């Protein structure tokens, strides 16, 4: 029997206390156009294409994680991902100068996440030219 496949997902945001984020203005790295676009429209983001590369069946696209982190966190904030999988959230946290804690039940996924994070660190430290 034919069926329609969902082509969208919800992102839900929960908070305790006030939704206003308190922090240093210098640690805000979202620009005005990003904020305006991301808060007034549906997002159209291509599915993750590296699931086979990282041997994980359900990865979020890096662009989705980056948008969420830039919207709801500042630089140096701590982000906890209790189902870290192949480490997409932690990798993007490293890229955006957020502190992070990632856990997963799979030892293999944890190893993959560590490799991705280490690679991201190398990219940040490598000079573009000498």
Feature locations, PLM:
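S-adenosyl-L-methionine
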Residues: 114-130
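Core catalytic lobe of class I
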Residues: 1-112, 128
